[in-house]
């Protein structure tokens, strides 16, 4: 912590730097990048099947600005958390170099894993570098609040009138996907029932599961940031109803976990009197009733909801359990590959694209799992989680990341932009807020 605080003081004391045009331009790029990746993450086109989104372009521009400044000024000052993030990226860079040399998979196959594991973590680095004041964090969170409002509005309009009627090519849906098919949303694994053309609500994310995972990640933070109690409760209600409307079973489980965490926090809160606990329990008890009425307006979603939580479907993990079991059996037989993973180096059986941790084991083994989860857990435990009793926003960040870590066992959407970007963005905001709080105590 002391080393991180020294690094923090060196950065926040750069008055001339903060007044420079370079810094102001970098901040503008950063703010645009954050807003786009939360609000319009699919804006852009595809080149050779690889998404070239506006959010990715602004992220790369921001990283380039950071990189040029570090080289130009020889400012090689990194906090402990940043070092862990960079070490994780270095591991994955080396691992994918071996993948490339192995020649068993083509560039178009492994680049989709490379970018989220090697490039997107630098979101944390650049945000930590360019954010030097608490008011910048406040501005970003306000920006994200209005961004999620836009996402909610698009989603509800699509659910009511049809996705095709409320889609803007190149902005709310990738332009290449849009022109390739008039039924593009049905081709993105958005069906809610076999043989039924009704699609999950996708809003501006183009995929129901991707939408659900991302709003679970950052909406708890935004909810806690709202000062007015009435508006905060309205936001929570809209958030819950929107999660139901996504049609994503992963999102449904995630919102249940989030509400369960909220209940535990309320009951264990030392200052909570009996009336507050009773009121909280009453509100939570009403949620299934409101949800049932809401689902009655969307019979396809209701049918999916009833079919989703049978023993057979839970055990099947939405069709993922068979390939996951095959991968586990592979590691039992080929234990020599458990450390670094077989991907691109040898033949293997089984797969686990959606299940983030099993996919990471396939790509980089246990070492890869440590390289990915290690920095996240370090930031979560030593920084954001340490101050949750002092800051509602940090509490929301911690809850959102914990929910993501849990649901990523089944559906992490890690390989689809903007999940990894938003994950590191939320962690960066929590980490930086923790440092500001430590600094204010001095």
Regions found by a protein language model. Give the residues of each.
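Alpha-helical transmembrane segments of multi-pass inner-membrane proteins
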Residues: 141-168, 174-247, 252-265, 378
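N-terminal hydrophobic segments of proteins, predominantly signal-anchor/transmembrane helices
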Residues: 25-44, 58-125, 401-408
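Interfacial loop-to-transmembrane-helix boundary motif in multi-pass membrane proteins
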Residues: 23-27, 80-91, 126-173, 396
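A juxtamembrane structural motif centered on a specific transmembrane helix
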Residues: 1-25, 388-390, 426-442
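Long extracytoplasmic/lumenal interhelical loops at the membrane interface
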Residues: 38-43, 47, 299-367, 384-386
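A membrane-periplasm/extracellular boundary helix in multi-pass inner-membrane enzymes
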Residues: 153, 157-163, 246, 266-311, ...
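Hydrophobic transmembrane alpha-helices and their immediate junctions
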Residues: 226-233, 256-268, 276, 281, ...
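Transmembrane alpha-helices of multi-pass inner-membrane enzymes
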Residues: 260, 397-407, 414-442
